[in-house]
Amino acid sequence: MRLIKSSIVLFATFILIFSLAACGKSEVQKVRVGEVTHSIFYAPQYVALSEGFFEEEGLEIDLQGTFGGDKTMTALLSDGIDIALVGSETSIYVYAQGATDPVINFAQLTQTDGTFLVSREKVENFSWDQLKGSTFLGQRKGGMPQMVGEFVLNKHGVDPQTDLELIQNIEFANIANAFASGTGDYVQLFEPTASIFEQEGKGHIVASFGKESGHVPYTTFMTKESYIKENKEVVEKFTRAIYKAQKWVETHSAKEVAESIAPYFEDTPIDLIETVVERYKEQGSFATDPILDEEEWNNLQTIMDDAGELPTDVEHGILVNTDIAESVISE
């Protein structure tokens, strides 16, 4: 009789363990994330992946390159991805087109512009006035890099339409090659291209647009309003993983961050990754928490308006959900 009881207890224990394992396995949720480009600028996202923060939250991330704001929004709206990492201006463009299921910003990743002004010639004692009369190779019209670029130029008394020759009809992927081939006196470049050009003697970094622009929701995680309603717990877990990564990046050295994200940039030397991370950390480009506040939102719309690209003024609470981020931070 005792043997039978022991067998029953053993069997019940086995069933319980098996059930818990099966339950845990079923809780893993796959989330498709589309990133507008693949960049060291998004270091906290890769830290969340490499340090296992998404895994801790029971999320399996399918990271896809959607390359370009328009393509990223198309993928999100057509359910090709669940969450987009892209500039917040895209959510305003979609809203202005009368979207019945608007795109909601729920977790901010970067809070400054990520581009740098690179001069073909070495410049001593650089001043923004030196751009007057020059040829400036800018970014795509309507995108955040170009709008911030124009905002900063105007801030320093340089009219991008009349004080210089502004070239902005070159595809994003070809801008660096165009400058290397001899087009333009100045160019607006992301890292690590800016540092590579400096190392190779093709250009010289003379200013940071990120330092000059102030805080803006430059790159944000967003999704459709319906997805948040139907998958609120998933969005909360996702935001929690990002916040863990943001705190990790803030408290670790550029070298440690570089080592963590190196597997996602196999073609980039580790010392260059470290240089880029240090530059972005130094100028406060990485958001330290996922909250997109009203001041940043209004700054974004001011920049868009100055560039003539703001289709309609949108209140912060309409396209930004801070409840999830605030809840995660308060835990």
Regions found by a protein language model. Name each.
Residues 47, 53, 152, 196, ...:
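Residues within well-ordered alpha helices
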Residues 66-70, 85, 139, 143-144, ...:
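Soluble non-cytosolic domains of exported or imported proteins
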Residues 90, 171-265:
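Pocket-lining segment of extracytoplasmic ligand-binding domains
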Residues 300-331:
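Conserved C-terminal helix/tail region of periplasmic/extracytoplasmic solute-binding proteins
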